[in-house]
Swiss-Prot record:
Organism whose genome encodes this protein: Tetrahymena thermophila (strain SB210)
Identification of the protein by name: Putative 2'-deoxynucleoside 5'-phosphate N-hydrolase 1
Assembly description: Monomer and homodimer.
Protein family per UniProt: Belongs to the 2'-deoxynucleoside 5'-phosphate N-hydrolase 1 family.
EC identifiers of the protein: 3.2.2.-
Protein origin, superkingdom: Eukaryota
GO terms (BP aspect): deoxyribonucleoside monophosphate catabolic process; nucleoside metabolic process; nucleotide metabolic process
Binding sites annotated in the UniProt record for substrate: 9-15, 24, 41, 88, 113-115
Purpose of the protein: Catalyzes the cleavage of the N-glycosidic bond of deoxyribonucleoside 5'-monophosphates to yield deoxyribose 5-phosphate and a purine or pyrimidine base.
Keywords, sorted A to Z: Cytoplasm, Glycosidase, Hydrolase, Nucleotide metabolism, Nucleus
A cellular component term, taken from the record's GO annotations: cytoplasm
Catalytic activity: a pyrimidine 2'-deoxyribonucleoside 5'-phosphate + H2O = a pyrimidine nucleobase + 2-deoxy-D-ribose 5-phosphate; a purine 2'-deoxyribonucleoside 5'-phosphate + H2O = a purine nucleobase + 2-deoxy-D-ribose 5-phosphate
GO molecular function terms attached to this record: 5-hydroxymethyl-dUMP N-hydrolase activity
Residues spanning the membrane: none
Length: 145
């Protein structure tokens, strides 16, 4: 990727009970160093609730798909199972030359789907702590240059 500021689509479980918003916030903060994160609200439940309070499901879909089409890369936190994240990863898998990083905690309740961890167009990485998140994102972004 060139020196032009990246547009980044971040996704993670929002309605699920296992969302780790502290890790999401670390991810969004790190991604913000490399470009514009179109979906920062995912990391902040109070912001998300405020944004989506008056939106119906179709409006949420249309908004998110629009952000996806504007983005140049995707970073997905896939530790907690999520239908929405699966949908977003489906979009990413069908888009040519679209770089996608999937992050998952090493110690977790659920095993990541082989359709995500084994997808040849995704970079799948596991982390143990926030320092790992920072290092993985830095390496991913370095590869884009």
């Amino acid at each position: 990727m060139s020196q032009k500021k990246l547009t980044i689509y971040f996704c993670g479980s929002m309605r699920g009970v296992n969302a780790n918003h502290q890790n999401y916030q670390t991810i969004v903060q790190e991604l913000s160093k490399y470009g514009e994160v179109l979906t920062t609200h995912v990391a902040y439940p109070e912001m998300s609730n405020k944004l989506e309070h008056k939106m119906n499901d179709k409006q949420i879909y249309e908004r998110d798909y629009s952000w996806f089409t504007e983005s140049q890369v995707m970073v997905a936190e896939v530790t907690a199972p999520s239908h929405g994240v699966g949908m977003e990863l489906g979009w990413a898998s069908l888009r040519q030359n679209y770089k996608t990083l999937c992050l998952s905690q090493k110690e977790k309740e659920f095993k990541t789907s082989g359709l995500i961890a084994g997808c040849p167009t995704f970079e799948y990485k596991e982390y143990q702590n926030q320092e790992d998140i920072v290092a993985i994102i830095a390496e991913f972004m370095k590869q884009l240059q």
